[in-house]
Amino acid sequence: MRLLFFGPPGAGKGTQAKKVAQEFQIVHISTGDILRDAVSKGTELGKMAKAIMDRGELVSDEIMNSLVKERLEELDSFILDGYPRTLDQAKFLDQATKELQKEIDAAVLIDVSEEEIVKRISNRRVCPNCGKVYNLITLQPKEDEKCDVCGTKLIQRDDDKEEVVRERYKVYKKNTEPVIEYYRKNNKIITIDGAQNVEDVTKELFNILRSFNKQ
């Protein structure tokens, strides 16, 4: 099985991708993994990517595309998480997987509304001392706003503030919507309601992929 995973920040996309990888024994790779792997191996592309990142710049589509293709050459089954992010990357991936005869079977969309994402992320609290993460709705501390482990007052990270979350969601929709539409037109999209609890999302996803795998 060759899968792509999409979903807004806070949808639990990474969690579900890892669960699927484990259940179906597929390699789960993220763009971060691909970059780190190429840099540590010291490949030509890895050296180019490292030089760009060392300057604090973003790795170009061209280099990222080549790195992804290089990694996919080594694998038969895979889950790609965090790629493609743009329509150009999606078109490149289509072409590359056709050449490698490893075409994408499905693109999984963990779909969650903006309001649900805001509710999830803006209610996160973190202990600045020991790093334990809480949620004021789903994983409350025993004592109000205090860490169960060390008693330190919990904080809200800047990234978890409502206005930042809404901006990230807006950027996600703007960049990813055309990519999702591209796969929808090609009948590759599997949409899962990500507003369910984690276990129910996993169960639904496993059931769909099991029947899909038998085809």
Curated annotation (Swiss-Prot):
Which catalysed reactions does the entry list for this protein?
AMP + ATP = 2 ADP
> Per its UniProt record, what Gene3D superfamilies does this chain match?
P-loop containing nucleotide triphosphate hydrolases
Q: Per its UniProt entry, what is the enzyme's top EC class, as one word?
A: transferase
Give a GO cellular-component term: cytoplasm
The domain section of the record reads:
Consists of three domains, a large central CORE domain and two small peripheral domains, NMPbind and LID, which undergo movements during catalysis. The LID domain closes over the site of phosphoryl transfer upon ATP binding. Assembling and dissambling the active center during each catalytic cycle provides an effective means to prevent ATP hydrolysis. Some bacteria have evolved a zinc-coordinating structure that stabilizes the LID domain.
- Principal place where this protein is found? cytoplasm
Q: Which residues bind Zn(2+)?
A: C127, C130, C147, C150
Gene name of the record: adk
Q: What is this protein called?
A: Adenylate kinase
Any idea which UniProt keywords this protein has? ATP-binding, Cytoplasm, Kinase, Metal-binding, Nucleotide biosynthesis, Nucleotide-binding, Transferase, Zinc
Segments carrying the region annotation (NMP) are: 30-59
Transmembrane ranges? Answer: none
Protein residues bound to AMP = T31, R36, E57, L58, V59, G82, Y83, P84, R85, Q89, R157, R168
Q: Which organism is it from?
A: Petrotoga mobilis (strain DSM 10674 / SJ95)
